[in-house]
Amino acid sequence: MFGFGSLAHGGLLMQTTEDEPADLSDDTPMTLTEFQDSIRRVLGADLPLGDVTRLSRYGFQARQAERYRDGRILLAGDAAHQFPATGIGINFGMLDAVNLAWKLAAVIAGWAPAGLLDTYHDERHFAGARALLQTQAQVALRRGQDPAAEALRELFRQLLADEQTLRRLGALIAGTSIRYPMPGPGQHALAGTFAPDLTLHTDQGITSVAELMHAARPVLLDLADRRDLREAARDWQPRIDIQTARTDHRPADALLVRPDAHIAWAAATGEPAGTAVPALRGALWSWFGLPRPVQNRSGALERG
């Protein structure tokens, strides 16, 4: 493949892509002769070049750090993973930062539960490994001109005609298809997933899950007027927000949404208080630390 385009300062950017690149490091200097030879192989003809100001090479770089956290050292973005130029993983550096930021803030504020920072590696390393697999698949689809490679590409063209498949692949590329493992038995199917952007009807007007997340705070979203769940969560205020709302397509009675928009816990439709309340308090404890101290009737402080 040969590509070129105009640069803002008036120059031209040219590049070639070959299915069988030389076994050289990206740091190995490229000579003008090498580039002209590559153009000849790709185009089948010589292309006269004027003054060349910069030459570089890049290959299929798909790699990931073994650990995203080692004590006080934390890796994110390109320091944690590198993906080839296929579009997959374009959001992953931002998602690393969003996952890590609220956990660091919790540690600094002093309410982080034990092991909270370790979940950054557990969750984002898993997500990065999936992205690496996807980039390798995309590169495999782009390479090769033999009948087997063409058949594979044709199969994917047919699959992409299906809207559901297209949405799934779009979520893979965006990085929102990840389901993080959540602590506790019998978790709802939504637990660990990226919160759906529901349209919400509240006493203050119409809003959405995405708008609620602008504050980057944990939210207990009560979708079924569950006073028992709201009362159970009050011991964690003002650390978390509690929002009651109605929606046309209710996926659960309530959602506990982390600041990174992943669901920490969900109450099944009609789930009794006997199981929902202790499960909610367990999730709040696991992700947002001990409940705030409350004062008993004698004036002594106790934990809620």
Question: Across the structure, where does each feature detected by a protein language model lie?
Answer:
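Active-site flanking residues adjacent to catalytic metal/cofactor-binding acidic residues
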Residues: 76-77, 95, 221
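Conserved FAD/dinucleotide-binding core of flavoprotein oxidoreductases
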Residues: 1-54
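Functional cores that coordinate and move charged inorganic groups
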Residues: 91-104
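Helical substrate-recognition/capping region of FAD-dependent monooxygenase/halogenase enzymes
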Residues: 37-41, 108-304
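Short FAD-binding loop at a beta-strand-to-alpha-helix junction that anchors the flavin cofactor
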Residues: 69-84
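Glycine-rich phosphate/pyrophosphate-binding beta-alpha loops
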Residues: 81-91, 144
